[in-house]
Amino acid sequence: METEQPEETFPNTETNGEFGKRPAEDMEEEQAFKRSRNTDEMVELRILLQSKNAGAVIGKGGKNIKALRTDYNASVSVPDSSGPERILSISADIETIGEILKKIIPTLEEGLQLPSPTATSQLPLESDAVECLNYQHFKGSDFDCELRLLIHQSLAGGIIGVKGAKIKELRENTQTTIKLFQECCPHSTDRVVLIGGKPDRVVECIKIILDLISESPIKGRAQPYDPNFYDETYDYGGFTMMFDDRRGRPVGFPMRGRGGFDRMPPGRGGRPMPPSRRDYDDMSPRRGPPPPPPGRGGRGGSRARNLPLPPPPPPRGGDLMAYDRRGRPGDRYDGMVGFSADETWDSAIDTWSPSEWQMAYEPQGGSGYDYSYAGGRGSYGDLGGPIITTQVTIPKDLAGSIIGKGGQRIKQIRHESGASIKIDEPLEGSEDRIITITGTQDQIQNAQYLLQNSVKQYSGKFF
């Protein structure tokens, strides 16, 4: 009696009679098989969570997380951390990961409140031990949510595609918003991929991304993000105080209304992304900083904070002059706008005009230099214009007036200006700290203005 061949031994050399060709339906079956076989492989998904929401995944006495492990035969963990973030790790095949996410997503959106028995009975549960994984105010999955995936930085290119073609296709096909943050998580090689939309669409998008990156080997060293190293001065797409202040509304989705810059595919009716986002869409993987201009030595490194520095603005009514680090004319160009502790930041820049601010951020004349990313092609921000980077130095004893308690001031400045702002730790033996500002020209000018006012208002009032 003829026995059925297992799927794993599907012959690649099968022929169709004497013609030696495969029928079209067989080709389609093989393609479907390849996809299903790939989804059966074990993969790991890591999701960045707010620490306060981890309890809903774990449940009282660990009942929820134990039920997820048992019902889906998967590895699910949420290691503890001392900061505001934790990482949800799920190891299973891609389809199972999708089912687990559909259980978990509602509680990540809603918080830790236990739903009513009526709400619980309306949703099919694998186990009544996961009864708190429900969304109280919505039936089914008709609500917006977002998840933050963690991926190795070398895998970003596979998600973005050539000239952004892949990420655009993902957005359109899954009807989600996808944002790949430029900055790596603190002390790691991980980057955040923010995905927003209806839960089913978000899950489908994540499954496609997992399928993409599971076929790509990681290049370079791997240092997974440890939430214990949370640092509010990094602009990597993690959770901040701003998220809590907005009563849990996802950062990627502002309230409905006019004025937003709509990055959704046309005809979808999704919520727009705001023009004041502190990051910009990354349409190509960052290759590190561009080389310094001739005759200038870059500080090295691969982070935006290490990009070459723009020239300072010239004095009014005069030619471009060299300035020393105290902001005074001198015979040596240091290449960095600097301020000393005794004269304070605002005293040095209070008198700058808008045109002088502009000259501080734009490449000048024949020695012009493109500060944009992506190998000179340039990136464009939400408000138009190339993304550029500039740096300023401040005395380290003034940094507190910018950062604020728990980093609240610097977060607010980032949010209001739309620029990425990073503050370096002082180098050994140095009395200065370097502030790196990345964004469009308008965003950088707004950030400089807000930073100046912060120093002016809070100087001497340290946290």
From Swiss-Prot:
Low complexity composition-biased segments: 252-266
Record PTM Phosphotyrosine, positions in chain: Y380
Keyword Amino-acid biosynthesis set for record: no
Protein's organism: Oryctolagus cuniculus (Rabbit)
Modified residues (Phosphothreonine): T39
GO biological process: mRNA processing; RNA splicing
Renumbered residue ranges of the record's region RNA-binding RGG-box: 236-273
Protein name per Swiss-Prot or TrEMBL: Heterogeneous nuclear ribonucleoprotein K
Region (Interaction with ZIK1): 209-337
Domain KH: 42-104, 144-209, 387-451
Record region (Disordered): 1-37, 250-329
